[in-house]
Curated annotation (Swiss-Prot):
SUPFAM superfamilies reported for this sequence: Voltage-gated potassium channels
Name the UniProt record assigns to this protein: Two pore channel protein 2
Outcome of swapping residue 734 to E: Associated with SHEP10
GO MF annotation terms: calcium channel activity; identical protein binding; intracellularly phosphatidylinositol-3,5-bisphosphate-gated monatomic cation channel activity; ligand-gated sodium channel activity; NAADP-sensitive calcium-release channel activity; phosphatidylinositol-3,5-bisphosphate binding; protein kinase binding; voltage-gated calcium channel activity
GO cellular component terms given for this protein: cytosol; endolysosome membrane; endosome membrane; late endosome membrane; lysosomal membrane; lysosome; melanosome membrane; monoatomic ion channel complex
TM annotation in the entry: 85-105, 128-148, 156-176, 184-204, 219-239, 290-310, 437-459, 466-486, 503-523, 555-575, 581-601, 674-694
Effect caused by changing residue 203 to A: Strongly reduces binding with phosphatidylinositol 3,5-bisphosphate
Location in or out of the cell: Late endosome membrane; Lysosome membrane; Melanosome membrane
UniProt keyword annotation of Nuclease present: no
Residues bearing glycans: 611, 618
Mode of membrane association: Multi-pass membrane protein
Amino acid sequence: MAEPQAESEPLLGGARGGGGDWPAGLTTYRSIQVGPGAAARWDLCIDQAVVFIEDAIQYRSINHRVDASSMWLYRRYYSNVCQRTLSFTIFLILFLAFIETPSSLTSTADVRYRAAPWEPPCGLTESVEVLCLLVFAADLSVKGYLFGWAHFQKNLWLLGYLVVLVVSLVDWTVSLSLVCHEPLRIRRLLRPFFLLQNSSMMKKTLKCIRWSLPEMASVGLLLAIHLCLFTMFGMLLFAGGKQDDGQDRERLTYFQNLPESLTSLLVLLTTANNPDVMIPAYSKNRAYAIFFIVFTVIGSLFLMNLLTAIIYSQFRGYLMKSLQTSLFRRRLGTRAAFEVLSSMVGEGGAFPQAVGVKPQNLLQVLQKVQLDSSHKQAMMEKVRSYGSVLLSAEEFQKLFNELDRSVVKEHPPRPEYQSPFLQSAQFLFGHYYFDYLGNLIALANLVSICVFLVLDADVLPAERDDFILGILNCVFIVYYLLEMLLKVFALGLRGYLSYPSNVFDGLLTVVLLVLEISTLAVYRLPHPGWRPEMVGLLSLWDMTRMLNMLIVFRFLRIIPSMKLMAVVASTVLGLVQNMRAFGGILVVVYYVFAIIGINLFRGVIVALPGNSSLAPANGSAPCGSFEQLEYWANNFDDFAAALVTLWNLMVVNNWQVFLDAYRRYSGPWSKIYFVLWWLVSSVIWVNLFLALILENFLHKWDPRSHLQPLAGTPEATYQMTVELLFRDILEEPGEDELTERLSQHPHLWLCR
């Protein structure tokens, strides 16, 4: 094989290593020589460009090996099959917590009624777990090979991945050696790490939270000072020498000692027990209200909202930095692809002095890139518009701005009818006024259901006469079926199905029709006094309930018809789709606190004698207590119950009941756990989520944040995605910065 010749003009400021002998597969040259290895080098350049563009699309680092075999492995690793396998493995190892001891496989979490759960035999879940750990070990090995040992040593996430795997395998071995009777499983606490390390956005979010902690801590310190000062004021105020009944009740109930006083005011800070804590003193003297009002105004209205503002400002700033890194990765990936492809221009003597990318070469690359068909087609059309003109670096970068647009689905053309009557009918039933009529009919159906629910509120299901409601439902369902068929006639089947609202509407109409036919087949036609005996699995009342619930659900079809409501609904859907990273962080936090809660409080909530039924045995329990409110299902006896308990605590309504119960059942130290959970979930995470909801809505309603229609087209074909909230604020990386970073690539040498 002929040795490739190094050019005198290096692409990125000078040849690295002082020579032209580059390792095979790592060198890209301005002139591709003709010879036995020319085809292989050509394929290598194409594959390198494909990988770099895919890295840019996914905001991945390009500092990986770029020889032929490594790129083959790299593309297989990031293929849909491998990534879905890895995601399923992460889901599986997290899901094991529901099956492992203590198992959540019971119908209820209430300690009074819960039967002994099925416990898996030793080795069953452990076998699944070790398979998952082996998949993670393979994942780590592939990452370590592709990015190299030097990168592995500097990457804390990869080092943490290795430590977590080693600790998990050691702990797994200990479990088997103790026949699954170990008192503590450390590896269960470490499992959420696998979810974190697999998401770059979760890593960025976690880093931003860590950077924002000092500012959060400063406001938290103010809150602590505020709480301590008013605790001392309260203890002094309600511990006077001449106490009236109100003072004494207040002191004994809420300010008996320092821990109780702190807890009472902390709960009041969350407004969970307002005005309960104030009532004993306020009932005797209205002047005592001043103390509680001032405390609430300063703490809840000023400091807590100040904390929200600081979290919004600081976190948004740090998120900008992380997103700036993502933007730089995209620009660096596309620039690397440009440099690789521009090195192929001189093949065969064409454009010997030109610098740019041949459109036909880029088209060949785009054919191999893993990209959705809509974006790929749009980009290829733009590339073809250049003809044989070389693409400059700037034009190459602008081409990939198409990735920042979401495709608006174009509806198929309507069927063409020759008959004037059919054309008029098509115009009538395809008009949006016909949708308004359908919405009015759906509203009338909903009102009829509401009327009968009100009239029959005090009537037992077995004594209800469903004749009139049954007739009305039959009429409405026939109209829904007729409406669906007329829309199919006007729009065509493909045109009808191209509207998501029609798919939703049509699917529910078919389900309603099947359910109504089943009801009529089993219980015959409605008639006065229509109360037949139960036949089959469901009674007439059960089938009517299902029918009415589907009709109520179908009423959601009005949302697309109301512009403002449609904007709000689309923004909410965008949040669901684009806030997965924050949902993942919440899953991690819930998982860790649930496992800790199980280890701390499993079995501490025990039903007292006389509380095994719903008989009024709780009459002796204090009003508002855990026992009187029958909160027995809120416990940490298994993973599912722990998750629900943590959710109820995050809402902070009546969370003082949990604090008091676990203090009595397990000890006063339990308050530390619940206060930490309140800080992490209700203060930090909820405020972060609120900040991002605000940013999302502001972006959605800002007309400047959307792309204008393309020139020469009647309407915009694309629009900005909700995912790119901050793109207009981010700073584009400079030319020198990109070339400098490319010159530092550990596995790629580019020469001209």
